[in-house]
């Protein structure tokens, strides 16, 4: 739902939601990407998976509202965490129930996720080949707890990071089998 459910109205999902991720990969590798292979599908956010009796908008009395993970009332009215992304011009502490109800009543953010005319993938994997035979696999997936994670595997060790403000980067070196935690500052 929202701005990116339909390619004709926005862009393909990898461009709309993950172009900065692929830019970061290019920067980290420091080489030109020479080949790309991609697989992706829209398998879940489709009309056929809509709960029985689900209306066009969640606020219109959906019979599945109580147990729906994507209930717009829960996501935007009851908890303003995601609302701040939709209304970035309004300070988080000034987001009100009235603003949230307006969003879910009058924008695509209030539509049932299964009834949004979705035509973009809900998961996609890219296999990329860079110069010097560096290979990268990137996965964009709607079915997770949110966030960005990176795992770099090299000949001398590996690096793992959750790209947020609180989780340290972990560097593991094979020679001494040690982990180093690098705080995010």
Question: Each predicted region: which residue ranges?
Answer:
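Glycine-enriched catalytic-core subsegment of oxygenase/oxidase enzymes
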Residues: 110-185
